[in-house]
Structure formats: C-alpha cells, structure tokens
Amino acid sequence: ANVRLVTTAKEATKLCGEMFSRGGKAVTPGYMSDFRRKIESTTGLRHFLTKVQRMPGAVLSIRHQRRLMPRQQGYVYFQDYVPGNTHDTRVVAIGGRAFAFRRMNRPGDFRASGSGNIVYDPGLIDPRCIRIALKVTADLGARCLAFDFVTDDAQGPLIVEVSYTFVAGAFHGCPGYWDDCLTWHEGQFWPQDLILHDLLAALGHRAARSGSERRGTNRQ
C-alpha cells in the first residue's frame, strides 16, 4: 500500500502538492527498495539465494499491480503515528467469531502489513482487540471485516485500518477462534467456508420463518 511516514510539516506540504497535481503511484515501494528490503531480511546463504530466485516474480507482480491500479490523485489521508509498536494485530471477525494473529514489522520499517512475518500464538493477543472487532462488526451490521490494531500506552488498542478483503491463507493459519463470549474454539478454517455456512444458515432461518408465517395465515 502507498503508506509513508511523514515527520515534518514541510514533508506534509510537499505530499499534498504531489497528490493534488500529478498524483502518486498506488503501489509502492519501487523495485529497488523492495529488493533491498527483502535482501536485508535474509538469514543465511540459502535464504539469500531463494530470495534472489524469487525477485523476477516479485518485480512482475509489482508491475502487474501498478497496471491494474491507476495513479492516485485529488486526495490525501493523514493518520496519527503511534510509535513503539513492533507489530500490529490483525483480527478478522466473521459471524460472531474472531480470528487473530500478530504481524511483525519489516526489518527497519514501521509497517507490518505485507511483511509475511506472522505469529499465531493466541496467548499474545490482547482480548480488548477481540472485543472491539466483534462489537464494531456487529454495530455496522457486517458479516465479515478485518481490523488492524496497534497499541498506545495511554489509550490502549487503536484501530488503524478496517478492510473487507484479506489474505485467506494467513487467516487459515490461525489455530482457532474466539466467540462473542471470548471462549476459545480450536480448529483451522477457511473464511469463505464460514461465510457460506453463515449465509446458508441465515437463508434456512428465513425460509423456516416464512413457512411458519404462511401456516399461521392458512389457519386463520
């Protein structure tokens, strides 16, 4: 995603000028900075060679994404930066269930999204994140939402992003989920299976209710 850390008013002014003129690319970083980040995260020769072998595919993927997404212009969003976070917490709420994991920051970067460094230990998840995600999803009347949280020492967990799409493979790695009573349920699931299950259950309840109403009308 096109997310940058702006540290001065001068940088903010420059960014506004850019976004309200020629605009900016929807997919960052550039090829070389992405290559450097991947190389810096290697842990040995074999890992290094694997990264090098994958780079042509990564470059093609970035080029493809940039073709699909036009330059962004005419708007700019600013969000408070919350320092001191080594990770964010991704919570996916589906039908009263909450799946969660930590995404560790990229080396030398403040961002966790897209790092691929995921920790699935449920004991590390702040239960406040679970409660907030389930409540917001219910309040919005949504069936499925993904939340990204960071933690502020004074304010506690803060939502930095809400999405309706997410990577299913990362979700499937969760060893279980919490229900709306914060009871833990073991098992691995695919989000699309749960969404379909909930949809069919809702249709079944609707059909049963409709049938009951028709029978009541006929008796009258």
Where are these regions (language model features)?
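Phosphate-binding core of ATP-grasp and ATP-grasp-like enzymes
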Residues: 19-24, 72-115, 131-145, 151-157, ...
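Short, flexible active-site loops
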Residues: 1, 113-119
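Short hydrophobic/aromatic-rich motifs at helix boundaries and adjacent loops
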Residues: 47-50, 60-61, 103-107, 118-119
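Short acidic/polar alpha-helix capping motifs at helix-coil junctions
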Residues: 41-43, 50-54, 98-99, 110-114, ...
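Signature of lipid phosphatidyltransferase scaffolds
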Residues: 124-127, 135
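Active-site nucleotide/adenylate-binding loops and adjacent lid/helix of ATP-dependent enzymes
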Residues: 1-75, 127-130
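C-terminal active-site "lid" helix and adjoining low-complexity regulatory extension at the edge
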Residues: 119-124, 151-220
